[in-house]
């Protein structure tokens, strides 16, 4: 086998799964079983099966901030709100050298929307009256790609897909503030905002910084590591994904869900950074 062919096979032999199926039901296991049946030497990676039910933004966030760490040519299957209440087109998208297979419900559009898709197809083959599109449509499409099949054989090109409005941070008057929201809460209860750290660096200059969390809660400095703050106190830092994050050191767990519970902040709640 030539080096080029071997590299292509290596790149096309990995598929990731992102679903809202959870871990107690057989749905995620069925996807894996069908994939292994179709391609016994496939490598399957679970990004998450714990996406909140029908939560497209969460699925797009998880996949959007993880797919770039996988080799180009990887296949990413996303199954969230697949269309059990109405028929939804199955799509195949090529972006940044990665294949994405999922429903046309907005989730594919929200995966790094600032990057234009290189190819977009509506998958043609369908099982009649399927109640499980991921198993009956997405998996066979992924298996075709895993066997190094051409993507354009799976369907026909389309110029459109459903787009969902994405909440973006806004810049205040005279660039004196940045207003954003909580876009994700991780397993530690850390609040990940949609405010890029690059914005703070660009607009702060030599001014002081104050982060307003509402309810008269404020943070007046940025830390560089979680260990810089005393236990139980909130801190702000720019996380590894490049976003402003609010955390509370050693306050995670079922009984105390970190910064989210301690500060009373949840998804889409407002966070404002002021410069003075």
Residue ranges and their predicted role:
Residues 13-16, 42-45, 74-77, 90-92, ...:
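Structural motif
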Residues 7-87:
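N-terminal glycine-/serine-/threonine-rich phosphate-binding loop
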Residues 38-43, 55-58, 71-73, 77-80, ...:
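Active-site histidine-anchored catalytic micro-motif
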Residues 129-205:
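Anionic-ligand-binding alpha/beta catalytic cores of soluble enzymes and soluble regulatory domains
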Residues 96-108, 112-126, 151, 203, ...:
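Conserved subregion of the PPM/PP2C metallophosphatase catalytic domain
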Residues 194-264:
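A conserved acidic, glycine/proline-rich C-terminal tail/linker
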């Amino acid at each position: 086998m030539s080096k080029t062919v071997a590299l292509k096979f290596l790149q096309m032999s990995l598929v990731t799964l992102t679903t809202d199926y959870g871990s107690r039901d057989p749905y995620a296991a069925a996807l894996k079983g069908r994939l292994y049946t179709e391609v016994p030497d496939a490598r399957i990676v679970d990004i998450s099966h714990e996406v909140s039910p029908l939560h497209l933004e969460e699925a797009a966030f998880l996949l959007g901030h993880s797919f770039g760490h996988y080799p180009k040519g990887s296949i990413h299957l996303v199954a969230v709100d697949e269309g059990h209440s109405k028929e939804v087109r199955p799509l195949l998208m090529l972006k940044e050298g990665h294949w994405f297979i999922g429903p046309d419900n907005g989730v594919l559009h929200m995966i790094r929307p600032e990057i234009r898709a290189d190819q977009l197809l509506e998958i043609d083959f369908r099982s009649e009256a399927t109640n499980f599109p991921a198993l009956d449509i997405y998996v066979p499409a992924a298996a075709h790609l895993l066997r190094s099949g051409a993507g354009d054989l799976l369907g026909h090109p389309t110029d459109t897909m459903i787009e969902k409005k994405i909440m973006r941070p806004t810049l205040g008057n005279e660039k004196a503030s940045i207003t954003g929201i909580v876009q994700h809460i991780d397993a530690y209860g850390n609040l990940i905002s949609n405010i890029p750290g690059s914005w703070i660096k660009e607009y702060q200059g030599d001014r002081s910084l104050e982060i307003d969390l509402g309810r008269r809660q404020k943070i007046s400095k940025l830390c560089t590591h979680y260990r810089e703050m005393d236990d139980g106190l909130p801190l702000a830092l720019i996380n590894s994904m490049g976003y402003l994050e609010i955390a509370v050191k050693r306050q995670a767990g079922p009984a105390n869900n970190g910064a989210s519970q301690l500060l009373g902040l949840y998804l889409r709640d407002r966070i404002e950074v002021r410069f003075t």
